[in-house]
Design a protein with these regions (language model features):
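Solvent-exposed, charged helical/coil patches
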Residues: 1-57, 136-138
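Basic, amphipathic alpha-helical patches used to engage nucleic acids or provide basic targeting signals
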Residues: 35, 39, 62-135
Length: 138
């Protein structure tokens, strides 16, 4: 199967991944929309970095429904879920593990970023995301 180029990061070719149609619980549509209007600071800060294909021409979805879950960000062309872990995630380790196993069962890759790092180290967060994408998809 021929690889298709998605973009270049640091001069390195990044290839698309073919992800099958994902399950979607339509009962979560209104919740997903309301979360997009929410103002979790770290999510807003990250979104400003990636919206409108501003991050290497890669298209990000925000508050994407996958199965019975709503993920923070999703890159369809790579099959990557990006989760921002803040204080609300500290007491939900079992839930997060179950959710991650489900996402990985769909052949998705989960990338986690701490809320604290986005607020305090954004440049390195974006550099680390570049490095992750290069490592996994070049």
């Amino acid at each position: 199967m021929e690889k298709k180029t998605l973009t270049y990061i640091q001069g390195i070719e990044i290839f698309r991944r073919k992800i099958e149609l994902l399950p979607k619980n339509k009962n979560l549509l209104s919740r997903s929309r309301s979360l997009r209007k929410g103002y979790v600071l770290s999510e807003v800060v990250f979104w400003k970095q990636v919206r409108n294909k501003e991050f290497h021409q890669i298209d990000f979805d925000r508050q994407k429904i996958i199965g019975n879950y709503i993920v923070d960000f999703y890159i369809k062309s790579l099959g990557v879920v990006i989760e921002i872990d803040g204080s609300s995630h500290n007491d939900k380790e079992d839930y997060d593990n179950k959710r991650q196993l489900f996402l990985e069962s769909l052949d998705l890759v989960v990338y986690r970023i701490s809320d604290y790092r986005i607020k305090n180290d954004l440049i390195d967060v974006m550099k680390d995301l570049e490095d992750f994408i290069i490592e996994k998809f070049s």
